[in-house]
């Protein structure tokens, strides 16, 4: 983040923004999708086993091979869905932690209001030391917010590197004639 970004800019964005609720909702939907895909894979595995007990021959071997490749992909895919949910959950957690570390907008607003009040009543420079102290405190708020956001940015990038690489489902038909 640029070192001259006002402290209140960062605070307002993180406090007034949409928050992490949409991330948490997405992670929950992914867990539901994982459960569905996982149950489908288990059910198909059971059906395939039953079918192989009763159906023998070259066509059953071809079908078992195709179904097996698809089931392997579906099983891996369902795990990837769950891994994605975990990554998104962690992103939501990191966002909330960042929000708690950013200086609240009201704190910054109070600082600025007090500076303006002291400036308005600064007869003969009586309030100059207090104004300087509040300005120094404001600079600390800015530095804190920038450091927190820089940490958030690098942590989010690190977490996103753990998103799984999605693979296409396998081709289950080789195109042979018969």
Swiss-Prot record:
InterPro entries: PPE_dom, PPE_sf. Signal peptide: none annotated. GO terms for biological process: response to host immune response. It holds the Pfam family PPE. Belongs to the mycobacterial PPE family. PANTHER family: GLUTAMINE-RICH PROTEIN 2. This is Uncharacterized PPE family protein PPE59. It comes from Mycobacterium tuberculosis (strain CDC 1551 / Oshkosh). The lineage of its organism: Bacteria, Bacillati, Actinomycetota, Actinomycetes, Mycobacteriales.
């Amino acid at each position: 983040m640029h070192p001259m970004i006002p402290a209140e800019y960062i605070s307002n964005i993180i406090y007034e923004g949409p928050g992490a609720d949409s991330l948490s909702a997405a992670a929950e939907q992914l867990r539901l999708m994982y459960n569905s895909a996982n149950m489908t894979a288990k059910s198909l595995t059971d059906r395939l086993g039953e079918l192989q007990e009763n159906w023998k021959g070259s066509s059953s071997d071809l079908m078992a091979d195709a179904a097996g490749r698809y089931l392997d992909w579906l099983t891996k895919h369902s795990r990837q869905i769950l891994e994605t949910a975990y990554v998104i959950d962690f992103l939501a957690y990191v966002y909330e932690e960042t929000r708690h570390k950013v200086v609240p907008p009201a704190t910054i607003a109070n600082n600025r209001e007090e500076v303006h009040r002291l400036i308005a009543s600064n007869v003969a420079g009586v309030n100059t030391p207090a104004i300087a102290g509040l300005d120094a405190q404001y600079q600390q708020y800015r530095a804190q917010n920038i450091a927190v956001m820089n940490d958030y940015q690098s942590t989010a990038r690190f977490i996103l590197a753990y998103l799984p690489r999605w693979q296409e489902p396998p081709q289950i038909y080789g195109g042979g004639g018969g």
